Amino acid sequence: EMGALSVSFGESDGCDMRVTSVRAQDACSVAQAAFSGGEMLYKIDAPGRHFAINGAAVLAVAEVLGLDRALSLAAMGRWHPGAGRGAHVTIHLASTDPKATLALFDDAYNANPASVAAALAVLSAAPVQHDVGRVSKGRRIAVLGDMKELGPTGPDLHAALADLPATRALDKVHCVGPLMRHLHEALPDTQRGLWFEASDDMAARLPRQLDAGDVVMVKGSLSMRLARVVDAIRNMGQGNARDEAEG
């Protein structure tokens, strides 16, 4: 009635902009999508199927507006997530050894069951470095804060994260907040890391648990203030932490 044009996107057969394949690589995602009988290949400067699918929504808008497709695809290839939204940062732990690095996924701005599952999938597939730190084995480590506003199902939804295949593939999971305690208790002993009610305590203790070669993902609802944990990890560096999107 209002004359609005509805355009759908996603991976289902009925979507107007249908994502047909996604290849998540170490630092980017390459996807293919079909729209109006044509195919397009595009890249996003971040690993993760969820980023590729969201990118399809942007490309659908560009198509409907009649924008130049080549320019749209080029612009999409330059997009990268910002701080707190999945930014990938390399932390240099020793100024004398360029290999002594720690990789950080800063996803501390928000969290819900779907976005946490997507972030864990990215972490579980991330490459690690071996034989560069004290532990010698590079590890995939998650630091998770409460997912807020889930109502009475909140405790069960937090505990259920332990059963995700991506979670089971991790080496260690540290938890912050009363709701995340349900996940902490559901984890096997080999994966169970630190638990604190507040982010300040985790920020004070976590750096001693990390080592060169590790890949760490920090994610939680904004009110959990996990940006403080991100800052603590960044402060482990020798003054030259590098956002991968900035090169």
Predicted segments with their positions:
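ATP-dependent carboxylate-amine ligase
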Residues: 2-5, 15, 26-27, 37-41, ...
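Short beta-strand elements of ligand-binding domains
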Residues: 8-12
